[in-house]
Design a protein with these regions (language model features):
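A conserved beta-strand-loop-helix scaffold within acyl/acetyltransferase catalytic domains
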Residues: 3-61, 65-78, 120-144, 154-266
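Active-site/acyl-donor-binding loops of N-acyltransferases
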Residues: 5, 9, 130-159, 234, ...
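Short amphipathic alpha-helical segments
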Residues: 1, 87-89, 183
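A gly/proline- and charged-residue-enriched helix-loop-helix capping module
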Residues: 83-110
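Aromatic (often tryptophan-rich) hydrophobic motifs at membrane interfaces
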Residues: 97, 101-107, 211-326
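Short, well-ordered beta-to-alpha junction loops that form the rim of enzyme active sites
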Residues: 119-122, 294-296
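Divalent metal-dependent hydrolysis catalytic cores, especially in the metallo-beta-lactamase
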Residues: 112-120
């Protein structure tokens, strides 16, 4: 098995076919797709001082057998590309490999202080890798949570057996309240990327104080447009006459749909109405899995009753002192979060 480090954007584009081939052979999320990683690096991460592209390509008999979509940040931490905004992180691989060999190769070329792999599911390659081996100066810890809802083909919400009559009535009430609105289901095949609608709603959200001024900057919009144009993303939109009330950017992977980024104004329950309208439409066609993404928000849990699952983070440090410092700082952060939650109540 040969290890190749991709450190330049031109090199990265040159392995697109290998990447697409590996991606097609397993049930990866959109966050492991070439488009997400390439445009995340090109439009955002490459512009930040101190970041170094460090994608790993493993080959056996001249054929790609694994890709690790990584970079090194200004603190010399090895991370997944765009891990802050990727709900799920993982490698693409159809063969086992020794991660220690990869780390050794990276250290021959770049200074590296630690490894920070976040947003790992229990069935991710790297979670399994950690469980099979004792790693010196390492840590596996619970990270955030995510939630999913499986639906049989049929009419929502009646195709979700666990919903009570009261819950179904509540869905009908929300739909009735927004009856004057129209729902739009946008794909590359039927509509151009709705950039002007996005700008309009973005400005309204900022004006209403619902988002900060840097929300959905131009670099992020380029990434969204590329995902849309590569058919990896759907736009679910709600209009009220000439006004855009809600937009959801939904990542698609066969019959699984992930609500990634939501936009909405101050119309009551408008984001929930957008969710209901999309789920209603998509589950009429096939058995469907809805992924509500990373972060367990009360309004999603209360309304949709999804299954909640745990994400994990895997860290490796250069020495024991680094590990102890990380644990100390992490504990302080948890204490401050706990105090903040109590104050908010």
């Amino acid at each position: 098995m040969k290890i190749r480090i991709i450190s330049e954007i031109k090199e990265l584009y040159s392995i697109k076919d290998d990447w697409d081939d590996l991606y097609s052979k397993a049930d990866y999320s959109t966050f492991q797709s070439f488009e997400f990683n390439y445009y995340s690096w090109l439009t955002e991460l490459s512009k930040a001082k101190g970041n170094q592209l460090c994608v790993i390509l493993l080959t056996t008999n001249e054929r790609a057998c694994a890709i690790l979509p990584l970079y090194i940040d200004f603190k010399k931490r090895l991370r997944f590309i765009n891990d802050k905004h990727a709900d799920f992180c993982d490698v693409l691989s159809n063969e086992k490999f020794d991660f220690e060999d990869i780390l050794s190769e990276i250290r021959k070329h770049f200074k590296l202080y630690s490894v920070h792999f976040i947003n790992l599911t229990e069935d991710s390659f790297l979670y399994a890798l950690y469980k099979k081996k004792v790693w010196k100066n390492s840590l596996l810890k619970s990270f955030e949570k995510y939630s999913t809802l499986n639906l049989d083909k049929g009419t929502f919400p009646y195709n979700v057996l666990k919903y009570t009559s009261k819950q179904k009535t509540e869905f009908r009430r929300i739909k009735k309240k927004s009856a004057e609105n129209t729902h739009h289901f946008l794909l590359k095949d039927n509509s151009n990327f709705p950039i002007q609608d996005i700008y309009q709603l973005k400005e309204r959200m900022i004006g209403l104080g619902l988002r900060k001024a840097n929300f959905l900057n131009e670099d992020r919009l380029i990434l969204l447009k590329e995902l849309y144009n590569s058919n990896r993303m759907i736009v679910s939109m709600v209009k009220s006459k000439s006004n855009i009330c809600a937009i959801s950017f939904i990542l698609r992977n066969t019959n699984e749909y992930l609500f990634w980024i939501d936009m909405y104004d101050n119309s009551k329950m408008i984001n929930i109405y957008n969710y209901i309208s999309f789920i209603e439409r998509i589950s009429q066609e096939n058995n469907t899995k809805i992924n509500f993404g990373r972060g367990v928000y009360d309004y999603k849990v209360t309304n949709f009753k999804p299954d909640i699952k745990q994400l994990f983070a895997f860290y490796i440090f250069s020495n024991k002192l680094q590990l102890l410092i990380f644990l100390f700082v992490d504990n302080i952060k948890e204490i401050l979060k706990s105090i903040y939650k109590k104050i908010k109540r």
